[in-house]
Amino acid sequence: MKLHTLLKLGVLSVLLVGGPALTSVHAAAADDETTEIGEQMDRMNRAFRELRKLAADAGSNAASLELVATMRAASAEAAKHTPALAADLPEAKRAAFTAAYREQMDKFIGVLDELAAAFKAGDNTAAAELVGRLRDVQRQSHREYKKPD
C-alpha cells in the first residue's frame, strides 16, 4: 500500500514539475512549424469568427467591411505561397496542386468582394448568405489543401 502511494506521488510530482516544461517545448516546436500561409489563415480565421457574429447586423456594416478587408488582404498574401501539403506530393503533381490552390484562393477572394459589395449596399440578408458561402469554400479548401494536424 505504501509503495502504491509513493508511486502515485512520484508520478504526480513529475507531472507537476515537468508538465509545464513539456508544454513549453511543444509550444516552441509548434511555433517553428508556423508557415506564412498559417499566419495568414490565423488572421483570416480571427476576422471570420467576428464577421460571422456581425454579418446580419446592419449597424455593424462598417466594422464588417474592415473585417472583410482584413480577410481579403490575408487571403491575397496566403495565395502567394505554396501550401505545406505540396511538399508531400510527387514533383509531377505539385504545380497542378499549387495552381488549384491559388484558383481556390481566387474564388474565396471573389466571394469576399461580393460580401464587401453587399455590406456597402446595406444588403445584410445577402451578406449573411455570402458568409455561409465563404464557410463552405473554407471547409472545402481545408479538406483539399491543408496538411492534417
What positions do the PLM features span?
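Short, charged, amphipathic alpha-helical segments
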Residues: 62-69, 95, 99, 128-133
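C-terminal amphipathic alpha-helix
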Residues: 111-149
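C-terminal segment of classical bacterial N-terminal signal peptides
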Residues: 16-26
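Long, amphipathic, charge-rich alpha-helical segments that form helical bundles/coiled-coils
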Residues: 84-120
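Alpha-helical segments in soluble extracytoplasmic regions
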Residues: 52-89
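Immediate post-signal-peptide N-terminus of mature secreted/exported proteins
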Residues: 26-67, 148-149
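Charged, amphipathic alpha-helical oligomerization/scaffolding segments
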Residues: 39, 43-46, 50, 66, ...
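Bacterial Sec-dependent N-terminal signal peptides
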Residues: 1-10
